């Protein structure tokens, strides 16, 4: 990837994780004069070792009148809870702040197609599934963005780029599109009520419609996918209005928008959006029988082609929305239905996302560590019965109150982490629960009870919480659960999960 417009130009990079390092690499190869900084001494030391040609000077010493742009890593806050000092500094000199995604969109060839995927839940799986199907169809595809490989590190000659884009990344693109809302108590924990939020959806999306008008044609992707929007990341975006506006930025400049309609907020966005659009649903048919993909608990039907749940490697129920979006995108890219079905059949899914680990006698073990909010856990809970549910961590806004209607599927809840007492209060007189010291304690207690049952049972790690109270990330939490399962199965006969 060549950033020719920045040749001989001074460009600053802040944040030296994977994204920042990829930006430095491309800038240097493109002949730009790169400046870089990070608050972390460790990250600075690593970057200095890798890129001798880069100027590692404190930003306060830059000649900001010479800096063409500041390329910011997505982890750096630009508004909430308060702007990072580098953001304030750049703005004081009217310096343009950009993301690596903007650099990529500026540099890509006109004939290269971009599929951008966002949403609160399901982004990574949908991005990966679309890419997998397109590769199965013989397309030259690159997959990345927020998922794994930074966008500027992707191969430069791909025919189609399938890019996962998080709200943190979208926030950096055309930042004036964010609606400032300074009332930080708008969705304060105990006062939050889902029903009240839904009443505000129409009001929010009226504002959002004006946002999409202003940003139309600015974020140029060929196909955008907006899966769903549920309460999340309010600590970063300041309010639900801001979060909705940021998530919706992707659809404004796309040639076609694929929008989920199982979610109240995105359904309202679909109704108000005036551009080219396709509705998708994982629970009902939105198009006529000849065009739509119908996903049931035991099978998937696409035109005259069928896939039974027993032949799929992923759970069709919990992945229904992801599959519907993938079908829509691949049909738009001229992939035939038979190839789409074969691609879904051969897709193994992603680790820590409703991942079937194996069976020990009557007990199925499922690692859904990526479920960091209630809506994500809901999909896993609806996929199984007689569940021993390991849940808890650092709770998100709204907790697990929205899952109360599904508690009948829970045999017992095993509570871990900071959220234990809050979740215990939610579950009181509704479901049997036990407080556990840690994940290992919960795993042991769950298996001791589950193995005694003559019925088929499921031990499900689906925390509905962030992992940061005990782990560095959801991957570390999930890997710990996987190791516990592997250690346990050594003394039992393994039945292959089908």
Curated annotation (Swiss-Prot):
Pathway it acts in?
Cell wall biogenesis; peptidoglycan biosynthesis
Which EC number(s) does the record attach to this protein?
6.3.2.9
Q: Name one GO biological process term.
A: cell division
Q: Does the keyword ATP-binding apply?
A: yes
Primary residence:
cytoplasm
Binding residues annotated for ATP, in chain numbering: 119-125
Extract one GO molecular function annotation from the record.
Answer: ATP binding
Subcellular localization: Cytoplasm
Its transmembrane ranges are none
> What catalytic reaction does the record list?
UDP-N-acetyl-alpha-D-muramoyl-L-alanine + D-glutamate + ATP = UDP-N-acetyl-alpha-D-muramoyl-L-alanyl-D-glutamate + ADP + phosphate + H(+)
Q: Name one GO cellular component term.
A: cytoplasm
Enzyme category, top tier: ligase
Q: What does this protein do?
A: Cell wall formation. Catalyzes the addition of glutamate to the nucleotide precursor UDP-N-acetylmuramoyl-L-alanine (UMA).
Q: Which family does it belong to?
A: Belongs to the MurCDEF family.
Q: Under which name does UniProt file this protein?
A: UDP-N-acetylmuramoylalanine--D-glutamate ligase
Tell me the organism.
Wolbachia sp. subsp. Brugia malayi (strain TRS)
Gene that produces this protein: murD
